UniProtKB/Swiss-Prot annotation:
GO terms for molecular function: ATP binding; ATP-dependent activity, acting on DNA; helicase activity; hydrolase activity. Residues 59-264 form the Helicase ATP-binding domain. GO terms for biological process: DNA repair. Signal peptide: none annotated. The lineage of its organism: Viruses, Varidnaviria, Bamfordvirae, Nucleocytoviricota, Megaviricetes. Residues 437-586 form the Helicase C-terminal domain. The keyword Amino-acid biosynthesis does not apply. It is an enzyme of class 3 (hydrolase). Its EC number is 3.6.4.-. This is Putative helicase 172L. It comes from the Viruses. Belongs to the SNF2/RAD54 helicase family.
Length: 606
């Protein structure tokens, strides 16, 4: 990160922001860009000019990259900066923005409508939620807009329907071993994307966009997925990736996003991933120059204090017996797999069940997944169809205790004496977190404390919901997961309704792109495979706009598979740092642990 910032400082010494251009941004009265956002716009202009032959320095190579990756810390304003730059640099064709359905509402309300005057800009939201007759949209229609905003799902549907991704494939030669196999996936050519007669969402693939901006670009960072293939089929003269975490799991994460931007130095993920060649190419091709990284310190901005509480919970009684039984069974399956008696996929499924069991055995006991051995071991957990046994789990009880301890003192739905509730909250917080936590906390009643709870399992959130309803009925909350239809309304309720203090979210839906600074507490029910997801989740509330101290509660089952996952995450952090922080002292590449047979065996203690 330091190397990239030094290069940017050198760049800004001979390139200056055009004040006249900035004055034409048409921001609403009272709003202006931060200095670091102006620097990003300067850098974007430099990168787009760099691809033009007349502006290219002698001997300077771009390796095909036309744009780059904007990796600002969450909350530094990637959305506003991207919008401002696109409005400032209009061209004959519009700019296309691709984001998730959940975050699309944020682009509309917290981006376009909040900062820009509608009289000066035109934005089309290409989604059925915003356009009833979306199938009638034509190229001529979208040409009247400055920016078109759509979602990854819309792109996926349109691309698969038209098979546009096939134009990106390089197939093996007839006489080679790779005959009829995909050798490489390239960006689609302009001549293939200039299809003026297409209608509906297909216009995404029939328009040579001036620029394409992919928000939360780590969503397509796995080159094996259909999403990656469909995004590669979107043509843009310039391409930009917006992400707070460009590397999450593997070295190919950064490669896939650079390939979308046009990188041609290494065209196959296999070559990038082989024996540390990716890091070598990254440095030799000076790809750090195509990535703008910035922290809050770099931006000279400060945030309120953030306190992380790592809480361990012990399994006891029948829950412990069930967990150990499934652990033993998973180890047995692993040994069979090593002798080719069962598949890796089956063992991986057992591993997921083990993770669920660490939270509550109830999570792994739907009728379709039960077997006779589980029925015998799980007894009341298996027979319980409504979660009554599940809410007795140590972790669920601890989370309910945390929620009560930080919200009871100012719950607007309670009729109890506020002073007694305040003492109760202090007493409970002391039992949970200790005296140091009490000393650092302000328990004075002001605005009701709001709390966000994250989990990777929807069934876990369902279980927590039942526990809250039984043990803390006055606590009002909303839950948003993959099946939730009215997400925007529920987010607005959490943010604006003083009586709604809780928001239960799956990581997949809520860990990216949302601004939820109304909350000051965050609970992570279980560890994810990478800390980047946790950091994204925490950044929903610990970001620009937050004025209060933030508390994060990580709940881990002691001696369980969860502790092993935390260790795996550390290795991934080191790998990401070896790329983005420019650590020249690293003589050999730092390899991220993969979820393969070796890693799985290590986590199982084999």
């Amino acid at each position: 990160m330091a190397d990239a910032m030094n290069e940017l400082c050198n760049l800004t010494q001979h390139l200056q922001v055009d004040d006249d251009q900035l004055s034409n941004l048409k921001l609403k009265n009272g709003y202006s860009l931060f200095p670091h956002q102006e620097k990003v716009m300067l850098w974007m202009k430099y990168r787009e000019n760099l691809t033009k032959k007349e502006c290219r320095k002698e001997g300077e190579k771009t390796w095909g990259v036309r744009g780059g990756i904007i990796s600002l810390c969450m909350g530094l304003g990637k959305t506003l900066t991207a919008l401002a730059y696109s409005f400032q640099n209009k061209a004959s064709f519009p700019t296309l923005v691709i984001t998730s359905k959940t975050v699309m509402h944020e682009w509309k309300t917290e981006g376009v409508e909040k900062f820009f005057d509608s009289d000066n800009i035109r934005v089309l939201y290409l989604h059925r939620d915003y356009i009833k007759n979306i199938d009638k949209i034509s190229r001529d229609d979208i040409m009247t807009y400055d920016i078109v905003i759509t979602t990854y799902d819309v792109c996926l549907f349109a691309c698969k329907k038209g098979n546009y991704f096939l134009q990106c494939f390089e197939m093996g030669e007839e006489q080679s071993l790779m005959k009829n196999k995909i050798v490489a996936i390239h960006t689609r050519k302009r001549k293939d994307a200039n299809l003026p007669n297409l209608k509906g969402t297909a216009v995404i693939y029939g328009t040579p966009w001036e620029r394409v901006i992919c928000d939360e670009s780590q969503k397509f960072a796995n080159p094996k997925t259909m999403t990656y293939k469909c995004i590669m089929a979107v043509y843009g003269k310039y391409k930009w990736c917006l992400t707070g975490t460009p590397i999450r799991n593997y070295e190919t994460d950064i490669w896939a996003q650079l390939r979308f931007c046009g990188y041609k130095g290494v065209e196959r993920s296999h070559d990038w991933n082989r024996n540390g060649q990716g890091l070598i190419a990254f440095k030799d091709h000076n790809l750090i120059s195509a990535i703008f990284t910035m922290s809050y310190d770099d931006a000279q901005m400060s945030l309120p204090e953030k306190t992380e509480n790592n809480l361990t919970v012990k399994l006891e009684g029948q829950h412990k017996e069930i967990y150990e039984g499934i652990l033993t069974e998973t180890r047995e399956m692993y040994k069979k797999m090593m002798n080719d008696l069962c598949s890796f996929t089956y063992v991986l499924a057992m591993f997921t069940r083990l993770r669920q069991c660490a939270i509550a055995p109830y999570l792994i006991t739907p009728d379709a997944k039960r077997n006779s051995k589980e029925k015998k071991n799980c007894s009341e957990w298996c027979l319980d169809k409504f979660g009554g046994a599940g809410i007795k789990s140590s972790k669920i009880l601890k989370i309910v205790e945390i929620i009560k301890s930080v919200t009871l003192n100012d719950n607007p739905n309670c009729n109890s004496n506020p002073k007694s509730l305040q003492l109760l909250a202090k007493e409970k917080a002391y039992s949970c977190f200790g005296s140091d936590y009490i000393k650092s906390s302000n328990f004075e009643i002001s605005h009701p404390t709001k709390i966000i709870v994250f989990s990777m399992f929807t069934s876990c959130l369902d279980l927590l919901s039942e526990a809250i309803k039984e043990d803390y009925p006055n606590f009002k909350f909303v839950q948003v997961d993959g099946d939730t239809k009215n997400r925007s309304e529920l987010f607005d309720q959490f943010k604006n309704d003083i009586n709604t203090q809780g928001l239960f979210l799956t990581y997949k839906v809520g860990s990216e792109g949302l601004n939820l600074t109304e909350a000051t507490h965050c609970i992570c029910i279980e560890p994810w495979w990478t800390n980047a997801v946790h950091n994204q989740a925490k950044a929903r509330l610990w970001r620009t706009g937050q004025t209060k101290q933030v508390y994060v509660h990580n709940v881990i089952i002691e001696g369980s598979i969860e502790e092993k996952i935390v260790e795996i995450c550390k290795g991934k952090d080191d790998m990401a740092a070896s790329y983005l922080e420019g650590k020249e002292r690293i003589k050999s590449p730092v390899r991220a642990p993969k979820l393969d047979k070796f890693t799985l065996g290590k986590m199982l203690g084999i």
